[in-house]
Swiss-Prot record:
GO terms for molecular function: glycine dehydrogenase (decarboxylating) activity. Gene3D superfamilies: Aspartate Aminotransferase, domain 1 (3.90.1150.10), Type I PLP-dependent aspartate aminotransferase-like (Major domain) (3.40.640.10). The keyword Oxidoreductase applies. Its EC number is 1.4.4.2. GO terms for biological process: glycine decarboxylation via glycine cleavage system; nucleoside metabolic process. It is an enzyme of class 1 (oxidoreductase). This is Probable glycine dehydrogenase (decarboxylating) subunit 1.
Length: 447
Protein backbone atom coordinates (compact mmCIF):
# COMPACT_ATOMS: atom_id res chain seq x y z
CA UNK A 1 0.00 0.00 0.00
CA UNK A 2 1.46 3.37 -1.04
CA UNK A 3 -0.34 5.39 1.63
CA UNK A 4 -1.89 4.26 4.88
CA UNK A 5 -5.18 6.03 4.13
CA UNK A 6 -5.35 5.27 0.38
CA UNK A 7 -5.96 1.56 -0.24
CA UNK A 8 -4.20 1.26 -3.62
CA UNK A 9 -1.50 -1.30 -4.26
CA UNK A 10 0.87 -1.51 -7.23
CA UNK A 11 -1.26 -4.40 -8.50
CA UNK A 12 -4.38 -2.20 -8.35
CA UNK A 13 -2.64 0.51 -10.31
CA UNK A 14 -1.36 -1.93 -12.95
CA UNK A 15 -4.83 -3.41 -13.42
CA UNK A 16 -6.39 0.03 -13.88
CA UNK A 17 -3.79 1.06 -16.47
CA UNK A 18 -4.25 -2.18 -18.42
CA UNK A 19 -8.03 -1.71 -18.38
CA UNK A 20 -7.79 1.67 -20.12
CA UNK A 21 -5.04 0.50 -22.48
CA UNK A 22 -1.94 2.39 -21.32
CA UNK A 23 1.35 1.21 -19.85
CA UNK A 24 2.31 4.07 -17.54
CA UNK A 25 0.75 7.02 -15.75
CA UNK A 26 2.80 9.40 -17.90
CA UNK A 27 0.86 8.23 -20.95
CA UNK A 28 -2.29 9.75 -19.40
CA UNK A 29 -0.72 13.18 -19.90
CA UNK A 30 0.66 12.61 -23.39
CA UNK A 31 -1.49 15.42 -24.80
CA UNK A 32 0.32 17.96 -22.63
CA UNK A 33 3.54 19.23 -24.30
CA UNK A 34 6.78 18.45 -22.50
CA UNK A 35 7.69 22.15 -22.61
CA UNK A 36 4.90 23.12 -20.18
CA UNK A 37 5.12 20.14 -17.86
CA UNK A 38 6.48 20.76 -14.38
CA UNK A 39 9.77 19.03 -13.66
CA UNK A 40 11.42 18.66 -10.31
CA UNK A 41 10.04 18.58 -6.80
CA UNK A 42 7.39 20.83 -5.30
CA UNK A 43 8.71 23.09 -2.56
CA UNK A 44 6.49 21.72 0.18
CA UNK A 45 7.29 20.24 3.55
CA UNK A 46 8.01 16.57 3.86
CA UNK A 47 5.32 14.34 5.32
CA UNK A 48 5.21 14.19 9.11
CA UNK A 49 4.34 11.43 11.50
CA UNK A 50 0.99 11.65 13.26
CA UNK A 51 2.47 12.86 16.61
CA UNK A 52 4.56 15.49 14.80
CA UNK A 53 1.56 16.67 12.83
CA UNK A 54 -0.65 16.92 15.93
CA UNK A 55 2.00 18.97 17.70
CA UNK A 56 2.33 21.37 14.77
CA UNK A 57 -1.43 21.80 14.35
CA UNK A 58 -1.87 22.34 18.09
CA UNK A 59 0.72 25.10 17.90
CA UNK A 60 -1.19 26.78 15.11
CA UNK A 61 -4.47 26.45 17.04
CA UNK A 62 -2.92 28.15 20.08
CA UNK A 63 -2.56 31.32 18.02
CA UNK A 64 -6.35 31.70 18.07
CA UNK A 65 -8.08 33.67 20.81
CA UNK A 66 -10.23 30.91 22.24
CA UNK A 67 -12.99 31.37 24.80
CA UNK A 68 -11.43 28.96 27.27
CA UNK A 69 -8.56 31.38 27.84
CA UNK A 70 -10.13 34.74 26.93
CA UNK A 71 -13.05 36.53 28.58
CA UNK A 72 -15.46 37.49 25.81
CA UNK A 73 -17.73 40.54 25.88
CA UNK A 74 -18.50 40.20 22.20
CA UNK A 75 -22.11 39.43 21.30
CA UNK A 76 -24.05 41.01 18.43
CA UNK A 77 -25.83 37.76 17.63
CA UNK A 78 -23.20 35.21 18.71
CA UNK A 79 -22.80 34.66 22.45
CA UNK A 80 -20.50 32.82 24.83
CA UNK A 81 -22.98 30.76 26.85
CA UNK A 82 -22.71 27.70 29.04
CA UNK A 83 -23.42 24.43 27.23
CA UNK A 84 -24.19 21.41 29.44
CA UNK A 85 -21.57 18.66 29.06
CA UNK A 86 -24.22 16.21 27.92
CA UNK A 87 -24.73 18.20 24.68
CA UNK A 88 -21.50 17.02 23.03
CA UNK A 89 -22.05 13.50 24.32
CA UNK A 90 -25.45 13.19 22.64
CA UNK A 91 -24.32 14.93 19.44
CA UNK A 92 -21.37 12.57 19.05
CA UNK A 93 -23.59 9.49 18.92
CA UNK A 94 -23.30 8.13 15.39
CA UNK A 95 -27.05 7.76 14.84
CA UNK A 96 -27.39 11.54 15.28
CA UNK A 97 -23.99 12.78 14.10
CA UNK A 98 -24.18 11.17 10.66
CA UNK A 99 -27.93 11.39 10.12
CA UNK A 100 -29.23 13.32 7.13
CA UNK A 101 -32.72 14.47 6.22
CA UNK A 102 -35.08 11.61 7.19
CA UNK A 103 -36.86 10.99 3.88
CA UNK A 104 -37.88 7.57 5.23
CA UNK A 105 -39.29 8.64 8.60
CA UNK A 106 -40.48 5.18 9.54
CA UNK A 107 -36.85 4.15 10.09
CA UNK A 108 -35.72 7.47 11.62
CA UNK A 109 -37.91 7.62 14.72
CA UNK A 110 -35.13 8.82 17.02
CA UNK A 111 -34.16 11.66 14.71
CA UNK A 112 -37.77 12.67 14.18
CA UNK A 113 -38.56 12.64 17.89
CA UNK A 114 -35.53 14.85 18.61
CA UNK A 115 -36.76 17.36 16.01
CA UNK A 116 -40.30 17.17 17.39
CA UNK A 117 -38.99 18.03 20.87
CA UNK A 118 -37.10 21.00 19.41
CA UNK A 119 -40.28 22.26 17.74
CA UNK A 120 -42.24 21.83 20.98
CA UNK A 121 -39.75 23.77 23.11
CA UNK A 122 -39.54 26.59 20.57
CA UNK A 123 -43.34 26.90 20.66
CA UNK A 124 -43.29 27.02 24.47
CA UNK A 125 -40.66 29.77 24.48
CA UNK A 126 -42.23 31.93 21.76
CA UNK A 127 -45.89 31.45 22.65
CA UNK A 128 -46.71 30.29 19.11
CA UNK A 129 -48.72 27.35 17.78
CA UNK A 130 -46.28 25.62 15.45
CA UNK A 131 -42.53 25.66 14.75
CA UNK A 132 -40.51 24.04 11.99
CA UNK A 133 -37.56 21.69 12.30
CA UNK A 134 -35.03 24.56 12.00
CA UNK A 135 -33.60 27.06 9.51
CA UNK A 136 -30.00 27.79 8.55
CA UNK A 137 -29.67 30.69 10.99
CA UNK A 138 -31.52 33.70 12.36
CA UNK A 139 -30.88 35.82 9.26
CA UNK A 140 -32.33 33.36 6.77
CA UNK A 141 -35.25 32.66 9.11
CA UNK A 142 -36.04 36.38 9.12
CA UNK A 143 -35.89 36.62 5.34
CA UNK A 144 -38.06 33.52 4.91
CA UNK A 145 -40.63 35.06 7.27
CA UNK A 146 -40.75 38.18 5.11
CA UNK A 147 -41.21 36.05 1.98
CA UNK A 148 -44.11 34.23 3.63
CA UNK A 149 -45.72 37.55 4.53
CA UNK A 150 -45.32 38.94 1.01
CA UNK A 151 -46.78 35.80 -0.52
CA UNK A 152 -49.69 35.66 1.91
CA UNK A 153 -50.69 39.33 1.71
CA UNK A 154 -49.73 39.74 -1.97
CA UNK A 155 -48.11 43.04 -1.04
CA UNK A 156 -44.67 44.27 -2.06
CA UNK A 157 -43.42 46.50 0.77
CA UNK A 158 -41.50 45.22 3.81
CA UNK A 159 -40.80 47.49 6.76
CA UNK A 160 -37.85 46.53 8.95
CA UNK A 161 -36.50 48.39 11.96
CA UNK A 162 -32.90 49.61 11.87
CA UNK A 163 -32.68 48.15 15.37
CA UNK A 164 -32.73 44.70 13.73
CA UNK A 165 -29.32 43.03 13.29
CA UNK A 166 -27.61 44.64 10.25
CA UNK A 167 -26.54 41.26 8.85
CA UNK A 168 -30.11 39.98 9.02
CA UNK A 169 -31.23 43.10 7.17
CA UNK A 170 -28.58 42.42 4.52
CA UNK A 171 -29.89 38.86 4.04
CA UNK A 172 -33.41 40.27 3.76
CA UNK A 173 -32.27 42.69 1.04
CA UNK A 174 -30.79 39.79 -0.93
CA UNK A 175 -34.01 37.77 -0.74
CA UNK A 176 -36.16 40.80 -1.55
CA UNK A 177 -34.14 41.71 -4.63
CA UNK A 178 -34.85 38.36 -6.24
CA UNK A 179 -38.56 38.66 -5.45
CA UNK A 180 -38.79 42.32 -6.58
CA UNK A 181 -39.89 43.46 -3.14
CA UNK A 182 -39.28 46.88 -1.61
CA UNK A 183 -37.52 46.99 1.76
CA UNK A 184 -37.94 50.17 3.81
CA UNK A 185 -35.84 50.61 6.94
CA UNK A 186 -37.39 52.40 9.92
CA UNK A 187 -34.98 54.46 11.99
CA UNK A 188 -34.50 53.93 15.71
CA UNK A 189 -34.89 56.53 18.43
CA UNK A 190 -33.30 56.14 21.87
CA UNK A 191 -32.24 52.64 20.89
CA UNK A 192 -35.69 51.32 19.95
CA UNK A 193 -37.86 51.48 16.83
CA UNK A 194 -39.18 54.99 16.16
CA UNK A 195 -42.95 54.48 16.37
CA UNK A 196 -43.70 57.81 14.67
CA UNK A 197 -41.47 56.81 11.78
CA UNK A 198 -43.16 53.43 11.59
CA UNK A 199 -46.61 54.99 11.62
CA UNK A 200 -45.70 57.36 8.80
CA UNK A 201 -44.58 54.48 6.55
CA UNK A 202 -47.59 52.26 7.22
CA UNK A 203 -50.15 51.97 4.43
CA UNK A 204 -52.15 49.28 2.66
CA UNK A 205 -49.13 48.23 0.54
CA UNK A 206 -47.14 46.95 3.54
CA UNK A 207 -46.82 43.17 3.74
CA UNK A 208 -45.12 43.00 7.12
CA UNK A 209 -43.20 44.83 9.82
CA UNK A 210 -40.07 43.24 11.30
CA UNK A 211 -38.60 44.14 14.70
CA UNK A 212 -36.13 42.46 17.04
CA UNK A 213 -36.78 41.64 20.71
CA UNK A 214 -34.42 42.29 22.45
CA UNK A 215 -33.12 44.36 19.57
CA UNK A 216 -29.60 44.65 18.17
CA UNK A 217 -28.68 47.20 20.86
CA UNK A 218 -30.00 44.93 23.60
CA UNK A 219 -33.05 47.14 24.20
CA UNK A 220 -36.56 45.78 24.79
CA UNK A 221 -38.97 46.89 22.08
CA UNK A 222 -42.56 47.92 22.94
CA UNK A 223 -44.24 45.08 21.08
CA UNK A 224 -47.77 45.93 22.24
CA UNK A 225 -47.56 49.42 20.71
CA UNK A 226 -45.98 48.13 17.49
CA UNK A 227 -48.58 45.37 17.10
CA UNK A 228 -51.45 47.88 17.07
CA UNK A 229 -49.81 49.94 14.32
CA UNK A 230 -49.06 46.85 12.21
CA UNK A 231 -52.41 45.10 12.40
CA UNK A 232 -54.40 48.29 11.75
CA UNK A 233 -53.16 48.02 8.15
CA UNK A 234 -53.65 44.23 8.06
CA UNK A 235 -49.91 43.62 7.70
CA UNK A 236 -48.13 40.72 9.40
CA UNK A 237 -46.15 41.30 12.58
CA UNK A 238 -42.76 39.51 12.56
CA UNK A 239 -40.54 39.41 15.64
CA UNK A 240 -36.92 38.21 15.71
CA UNK A 241 -36.10 37.10 19.23
CA UNK A 242 -33.21 35.72 21.27
CA UNK A 243 -34.77 32.51 22.65
CA UNK A 244 -32.82 32.69 25.91
CA UNK A 245 -34.35 36.07 26.72
CA UNK A 246 -37.79 34.48 26.49
CA UNK A 247 -36.98 32.63 29.69
CA UNK A 248 -37.89 35.88 31.47
CA UNK A 249 -39.50 38.18 28.88
CA UNK A 250 -43.14 37.92 27.83
CA UNK A 251 -43.11 35.84 24.61
CA UNK A 252 -43.92 37.65 21.34
CA UNK A 253 -46.92 35.37 20.82
CA UNK A 254 -48.61 37.06 23.78
CA UNK A 255 -48.28 40.39 21.98
CA UNK A 256 -50.01 39.15 18.84
CA UNK A 257 -46.96 38.34 16.72
CA UNK A 258 -47.83 36.44 13.54
CA UNK A 259 -44.34 34.97 13.08
CA UNK A 260 -41.49 34.64 15.57
CA UNK A 261 -38.04 33.79 14.28
CA UNK A 262 -34.51 33.85 15.62
CA UNK A 263 -31.33 31.90 16.25
CA UNK A 264 -31.05 29.05 18.76
CA UNK A 265 -27.28 29.60 19.13
CA UNK A 266 -27.56 30.56 22.84
CA UNK A 267 -28.59 26.99 23.60
CA UNK A 268 -25.70 24.55 23.30
CA UNK A 269 -24.20 25.86 20.04
CA UNK A 270 -20.62 27.20 20.29
CA UNK A 271 -19.47 30.44 18.72
CA UNK A 272 -17.04 28.68 16.31
CA UNK A 273 -16.12 31.61 14.03
CA UNK A 274 -19.74 32.71 13.71
CA UNK A 275 -21.36 29.48 12.55
CA UNK A 276 -22.97 27.20 11.74
CA UNK A 277 -26.01 28.12 13.78
CA UNK A 278 -29.62 27.02 13.96
CA UNK A 279 -32.46 29.31 12.99
CA UNK A 280 -35.95 28.72 14.30
CA UNK A 281 -39.30 29.66 12.75
CA UNK A 282 -42.56 29.67 14.71
CA UNK A 283 -45.99 30.90 13.69
CA UNK A 284 -49.73 30.52 14.26
CA UNK A 285 -51.99 27.79 12.94
CA UNK A 286 -53.19 30.22 10.26
CA UNK A 287 -49.83 29.96 8.47
CA UNK A 288 -49.07 26.31 9.22
CA UNK A 289 -49.33 25.28 5.56
CA UNK A 290 -47.12 28.14 4.41
CA UNK A 291 -44.26 27.69 6.86
CA UNK A 292 -40.90 26.91 5.17
CA UNK A 293 -38.75 23.92 6.01
CA UNK A 294 -39.75 20.59 7.45
CA UNK A 295 -42.41 19.83 10.04
CA UNK A 296 -42.40 16.78 12.26
CA UNK A 297 -45.74 15.61 13.59
CA UNK A 298 -46.80 13.07 16.19
CA UNK A 299 -49.25 10.33 15.27
CA UNK A 300 -50.14 6.70 16.03
CA UNK A 301 -49.51 3.63 13.88
CA UNK A 302 -51.94 0.85 13.00
CA UNK A 303 -51.26 -0.75 16.37
CA UNK A 304 -52.00 2.44 18.28
CA UNK A 305 -48.36 3.10 19.15
CA UNK A 306 -46.98 6.63 19.14
CA UNK A 307 -44.85 7.51 16.13
CA UNK A 308 -43.37 10.53 14.37
CA UNK A 309 -43.68 11.54 10.72
CA UNK A 310 -42.74 14.33 8.36
CA UNK A 311 -46.07 16.04 7.90
CA UNK A 312 -47.54 18.49 5.36
CA UNK A 313 -44.80 17.49 2.90
CA UNK A 314 -46.69 18.88 -0.09
CA UNK A 315 -45.22 22.27 0.92
CA UNK A 316 -41.66 21.07 0.26
CA UNK A 317 -39.46 21.20 -2.83
CA UNK A 318 -38.86 17.44 -3.01
CA UNK A 319 -42.63 17.04 -3.59
CA UNK A 320 -43.59 20.09 -5.66
CA UNK A 321 -40.51 22.13 -6.44
CA UNK A 322 -42.27 24.87 -8.40
CA UNK A 323 -44.90 25.39 -5.69
CA UNK A 324 -42.76 24.83 -2.59
CA UNK A 325 -43.13 27.28 0.30
CA UNK A 326 -39.34 27.72 0.26
CA UNK A 327 -36.26 26.10 -1.19
CA UNK A 328 -34.51 25.31 2.08
CA UNK A 329 -33.10 21.81 1.76
CA UNK A 330 -30.95 20.35 4.53
CA UNK A 331 -31.99 21.86 7.83
CA UNK A 332 -29.72 22.30 10.82
CA UNK A 333 -30.90 19.11 12.51
CA UNK A 334 -27.65 18.46 14.40
CA UNK A 335 -27.56 21.98 15.82
CA UNK A 336 -31.28 21.80 16.57
CA UNK A 337 -30.49 18.65 18.53
CA UNK A 338 -27.79 20.55 20.44
CA UNK A 339 -30.33 23.24 21.32
CA UNK A 340 -32.89 20.61 22.36
CA UNK A 341 -30.43 18.79 24.60
CA UNK A 342 -29.25 22.05 26.17
CA UNK A 343 -32.80 23.24 26.88
CA UNK A 344 -33.78 19.84 28.24
CA UNK A 345 -30.73 19.65 30.50
CA UNK A 346 -31.34 23.15 31.82
CA UNK A 347 -35.08 22.69 32.22
CA UNK A 348 -37.56 25.54 32.61
CA UNK A 349 -36.03 26.70 35.88
CA UNK A 350 -32.53 26.49 34.46
CA UNK A 351 -33.38 28.53 31.35
CA UNK A 352 -35.06 31.13 33.55
CA UNK A 353 -32.09 31.29 35.93
CA UNK A 354 -29.64 31.53 33.02
CA UNK A 355 -31.61 34.44 31.56
CA UNK A 356 -31.80 36.17 34.95
CA UNK A 357 -28.04 35.89 35.38
CA UNK A 358 -27.54 37.52 31.98
CA UNK A 359 -29.71 40.44 33.09
CA UNK A 360 -28.14 40.87 36.53
CA UNK A 361 -24.54 40.63 35.30
CA UNK A 362 -25.21 43.03 32.42
CA UNK A 363 -26.80 45.48 34.86
CA UNK A 364 -23.75 45.24 37.11
CA UNK A 365 -21.44 45.90 34.16
CA UNK A 366 -23.52 48.92 33.11
CA UNK A 367 -23.26 50.43 36.61
CA UNK A 368 -19.50 49.87 36.66
CA UNK A 369 -19.07 51.64 33.32
CA UNK A 370 -21.12 54.60 34.53
CA UNK A 371 -19.14 54.83 37.77
CA UNK A 372 -15.96 54.89 35.69
CA UNK A 373 -17.24 57.90 33.75
CA UNK A 374 -18.42 56.16 30.59
CA UNK A 375 -21.71 57.13 29.01
CA UNK A 376 -24.13 54.26 28.48
CA UNK A 377 -26.03 55.61 25.50
CA UNK A 378 -29.50 54.09 25.68
CA UNK A 379 -31.34 54.18 29.00
CA UNK A 380 -34.28 51.82 28.37
CA UNK A 381 -34.62 48.29 29.74
CA UNK A 382 -32.23 45.78 28.17
CA UNK A 383 -31.37 42.08 28.31
CA UNK A 384 -27.65 41.24 28.16
CA UNK A 385 -26.23 43.92 25.86
CA UNK A 386 -25.83 47.68 26.09
CA UNK A 387 -24.04 50.45 24.19
CA UNK A 388 -21.06 52.36 25.60
CA UNK A 389 -19.68 55.61 24.15
CA UNK A 390 -15.92 55.01 24.17
CA UNK A 391 -14.80 58.41 22.81
CA UNK A 392 -12.03 56.57 20.96
CA UNK A 393 -11.93 54.12 18.04
CA UNK A 394 -13.32 50.80 19.23
CA UNK A 395 -10.80 48.85 17.16
CA UNK A 396 -7.90 50.46 19.03
CA UNK A 397 -9.52 49.63 22.35
CA UNK A 398 -10.22 46.04 21.33
CA UNK A 399 -6.65 45.54 20.11
CA UNK A 400 -5.38 46.62 23.53
CA UNK A 401 -7.93 44.49 25.37
CA UNK A 402 -6.95 41.43 23.36
CA UNK A 403 -3.40 41.73 24.67
CA UNK A 404 -4.90 41.58 28.17
CA UNK A 405 -6.84 38.38 27.47
CA UNK A 406 -10.15 40.12 26.83
CA UNK A 407 -12.30 40.00 23.69
CA UNK A 408 -13.99 43.39 23.61
CA UNK A 409 -17.45 44.34 22.39
CA UNK A 410 -18.78 44.90 18.89
CA UNK A 411 -17.76 48.05 16.99
CA UNK A 412 -21.08 49.67 16.05
CA UNK A 413 -19.30 52.15 13.79
CA UNK A 414 -18.89 49.31 11.27
CA UNK A 415 -22.60 49.53 10.47
CA UNK A 416 -23.68 53.05 11.41
CA UNK A 417 -21.57 56.19 11.06
CA UNK A 418 -23.69 57.82 13.79
CA UNK A 419 -22.34 55.23 16.21
CA UNK A 420 -18.62 55.59 15.52
CA UNK A 421 -16.63 55.04 18.74
CA UNK A 422 -19.56 53.17 20.27
CA UNK A 423 -19.17 49.63 21.59
CA UNK A 424 -21.92 47.04 22.01
CA UNK A 425 -20.99 45.16 25.19
CA UNK A 426 -22.45 41.69 25.81
CA UNK A 427 -22.42 40.13 29.28
CA UNK A 428 -23.54 36.52 29.64
CA UNK A 429 -23.89 34.21 32.64
CA UNK A 430 -20.29 33.00 32.11
CA UNK A 431 -18.71 36.35 32.90
CA UNK A 432 -17.48 36.76 36.46
CA UNK A 433 -17.40 39.89 38.61
CA UNK A 434 -13.61 39.89 38.35
CA UNK A 435 -13.73 39.72 34.54
CA UNK A 436 -16.27 42.55 34.35
CA UNK A 437 -14.22 44.71 36.72
CA UNK A 438 -11.07 44.02 34.68
CA UNK A 439 -12.81 45.02 31.44
CA UNK A 440 -14.05 48.30 32.90
CA UNK A 441 -10.71 49.14 34.53
CA UNK A 442 -8.72 48.36 31.39
CA UNK A 443 -11.05 50.46 29.24
CA UNK A 444 -10.88 53.24 31.81
CA UNK A 445 -7.09 53.20 31.61
CA UNK A 446 -7.23 53.46 27.81
CA UNK A 447 -9.49 56.55 27.82
Amino acid sequence: MLHRYLPMTEEDKKEMLETIGVQTIDELFSDIPESVRFKGDLKIKQAKSEPELLKELSGLARKNANLKEYASFLGAGVYDHYAPVIVDHVLSRSEFYTAYTPYQPEISQGELQAIFEFQTMICELTGMDVANSSMYDGGTALAEAAMLAAGHTRKKKILVSKAVHPESRAVLETYAKGQHLEVVEIDHKDGVTNLDGLQSEMDDTVACVIVQYPNFFGQIEKLADIEKIVHEQKALFIVSSNPLSLGVLTPPGKFGADIVIGDAQPFGIPTQFGGPHCGYFATTKAFMRKIPGRLVGQTVDTEGKRGFVLTLQAREQHIRRDKATSNICSNQALNALAASVAMTALGKRGVKEMARQNISKAQYAKRQFEEKGFKVVFTGPFFNEFVVDCKRPVKEINDTLLQKGIIGGYDLGRDDEKLVNHMLVAVTELRTKAEIDTLVNEMGAIQ
